């Protein structure tokens, strides 16, 4: 059911401009996840030796991790949920039932929750969970 392809008219920039590139959206999210994972690994490695340089580099990696997790939350909330996911009663909705719509909301919410968890931790397992959630959600945005 979550394998729906969202094909709606509207705009990702809230104008609406009618320009969508859903595969690029999925690619951007996956790239952000790869960056988050790398940041987590780097923070772990740098924390083995605490000196001024490593503390500086860890701070930069923490900031990078935060920025990319925030980017994911923004993409999902502002692009996906505000522009692409429409209630099943909406004539532009890709969902055939309320249950499909609710499942899609849950899938998107799981990505946002996992992204926030990545902000809170440096455990690469959380990046893996984010990637898994994003792949599931991403099925809705890839060509059939």
Question: What are these model-derived regions, one by one?
Answer:
Residues 6-53:
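Immediate post-signal-peptide N-terminus of mature secreted/exported proteins
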Residues 34, 38-41, 67-70, 109, ...:
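Solvent-exposed, polar/charged alpha-helical surfaces in well-ordered, non-transmembrane soluble domains
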Residues 15-22, 48-62, 93-101, 120-131:
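Alpha-helical rod/repeat scaffolding segments in eukaryotic adaptors/tethers
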Residues 25-32, 58-61, 65-68, 72, ...:
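Amphipathic alpha-helix face/heptad-repeat signature
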Residues 97-144:
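Helix-rich interaction surfaces within compact, conserved domain-sized segments
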Residues 36, 40-79, 83:
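Alpha-helical segments in soluble extracytoplasmic regions
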């Amino acid at each position: 059911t979550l394998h729906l392809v969202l094909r709606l008219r509207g705009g990702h920039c809230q104008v609406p401009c009618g320009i969508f590139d859903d595969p690029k959206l999925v690619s951007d999210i996956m790239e952000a996840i790869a960056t988050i994972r790398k940041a987590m690994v780097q923070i772990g490695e740098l924390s083995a030796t605490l000196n001024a340089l490593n503390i500086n580099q860890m701070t930069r990696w923490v900031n990078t991790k935060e920025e990319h997790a925030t980017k994911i939350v923004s993409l999902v909330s502002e692009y996906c949920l505000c522009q692409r996911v429409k209630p099943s009663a909406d004539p532009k909705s890709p969902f055939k039932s309320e249950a499909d719509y609710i499942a899609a909301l849950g899938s998107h919410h799981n990505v946002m929750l996992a992204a926030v968890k990545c902000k809170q931790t440096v455990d690469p397992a959380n990046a893996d969970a984010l990637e898994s959630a994003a792949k599931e959600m991403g099925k809705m945005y890839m060509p059939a």
